[in-house]
Regions:
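A short, solvent-exposed loop/turn motif at the edges and junctions
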Residues: 90-106
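Structural motif
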Residues: 25-52
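Hydrophobic beta-strand segments
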Residues: 53-58
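Short Pro-Gly-centered beta-turn/loop motif in secreted/extracellular proteins
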Residues: 78-88, 94
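Short, acidic Ser/Thr/Gly-rich low-complexity loop/linker segments typical of extracellular
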Residues: 61-76
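Feature of secretome-associated and extracellular-like proteins
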Residues: 21-25, 100-101, 107-189
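Bacterial Sec-dependent N-terminal signal peptides
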Residues: 1-31
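Solvent-exposed strand-loop boundary residues in beta-sheet-rich modules
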Residues: 45, 59-63, 95-97
Length: 189
């Protein structure tokens, strides 16, 4: 066996071992009933700047089990989510504010699973200013759920708006405080 073949076989074994460590609910469902989530982690102000980071995926409803994995060096992430559960995904990168998304895989018709369910996400992160209160970024800022009329996963705008508004207020406050234009604990109007 030459060196090239050895490296190829070793690489395949490592990939299989890493895949085997994932919980079942992150692997493709054996009967095709899983949503495939793929996306890119980017800087919010410069979306051409991709970020290497970390994703923490939690099966909130069924086992409360979490799995942490890294994005690629080019910010790419991919995972599967099985039917009939609620999941949260936390996205982070050094020096940036962690953001969360909720995925609800309940109420997806069997016909939709047969066609395949894909969710594409461009996750934009903000640089974390000094004094930013992390508490406002704990709640998921978006919630994806299957829309029967549109026949695809969409995010719930009503659920999202209030969380985003509070996040944006705190981000503006922390940035202004960092620049010295307002008192650190004063809310921004």
């Amino acid at each position: 066996m030459n060196k090239k073949s050895f490296i190829l076989i070793l690489s395949m074994l490592v990939i299989n071992m890493l895949h085997a460590q994932k919980p079942d609910w992150m692997k493709p469902h054996p009967e095709g009933r899983s949503a495939f989530v793929q996306g890119l982690l980017v800087d919010r102000e410069d979306s051409l700047k991709v970020l290497a980071g970390e994703v923490v995926l939690t099966n909130v409803e069924n086992s409360n089990e979490s799995y942490t994995f890294s994005t690629t060096s080019t910010g790419v992430f991919q995972f599967h989510l099985w039917e009939n559960s609620i999941y949260t995904a936390s996205f982070s990168s050094n020096g940036y504010i962690t953001r969360r998304i909720e995925f609800n895989t309940h109420d997806v018709p069997a016909k939709a699973w047969k066609k395949g369910c894909d969710i594409d996400v461009k996750m934009s992160l903000d640089i974390k200013p000094n004094g930013f209160k992390e508490l406002v970024s704990v709640l998921p800022f978006a919630s994806f759920k299957y829309d029967l009329d549109e026949r695809l996963f969409l995010f719930d705008v009503t659920k999202t708006d209030a969380v985003i508004e509070r996040y944006e207020q705190e981000l503006a406050r922390a940035r202004a405080a960092e620049k010295g234009t307002v008192e650190p604990n004063q809310p921004q109007d």
